[in-house]
Amino acid sequence: EQTFEAETVDGLPSQADLEAAMRELGRSLESLRKAPVTEPFDGPAILSGRAAAVFFHEVLGHRLEGQRQRGEQEGQTFTKDVGKPVLPDFLSVSDDPTIRRFGSTWLSGSYEYDDEGEKARRVDLISDGVLKTFLMSRLPIANFGSSNSHGRAETGHVPTGRQGNLIVSSTKSVLESELRKQLIEEAKKQSKPYGLYFEDISSGFAVTTRRSPQA
């Protein structure tokens, strides 16, 4: 399955691009049909940029939403970690709904005002690995009493703190070819027959409640 989104009709793929995507999907399905059945594997892995985006959105982003720090049913993964390191010090995370494009890519999380009328603004969530704040609507939580313009809602629902455009930045970077070499080296170091490279992830799903296996 593959979906396409665009800011305007002109941004949608051409007929030729759609046909190329269909052919690529067919090749992928054929490869899956021929692929051997695999067993659970414990070993080194690398996520591509696209796969890492889904990972950060689901695993980290949802747990930094303000309302998830409230209530006994929530896992509250990071509630008590403000001011503490939660990521390596070369990583920082922000959420910026004011930017409409990243390079040539249109960002669907952009907005001028959130659903509570607050003007959109960038929020630095994690700086140099240290947790600074949460994504806030006007619903207060302990030590955070006001909105930071991330109150968003589906039709008919009360606005809550939600992600816009989650941006992960790093002070360390290497070429993809070098990452692949490091993956092979790590697999050999761990005496594993191979490592895993995740090119894409079809979708994400996060449950943050206390009784969930994901909590």
Question: What is the predicted function of each stretch?
Answer:
Residues 2, 15, 67-69, 73-76, ...:
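Residue-identity detector for glutamine
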Residues 65-90:
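Amphipathic alpha-helical
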Residues 81-215:
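Dual-mode signal for accessory low-complexity, basic/Gly-rich regions
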Residues 1-66, 87, 132-133:
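Internal alpha/beta scaffold segment
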Residues 30-37, 67-68, 187-192, 197:
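Residue-level signal for secondary-structure boundary elements
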Residues 55-73, 159-173:
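Short N-terminal helix-initiation segments at or just after the protein's N-terminus
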Residues 41-44, 48, 64, 70-75, ...:
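A sequence-level detector of short, solvent-exposed, charge-rich linear segments
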Residues 4, 76, 105-108:
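Generic signal for short, ordered secondary-structure residues
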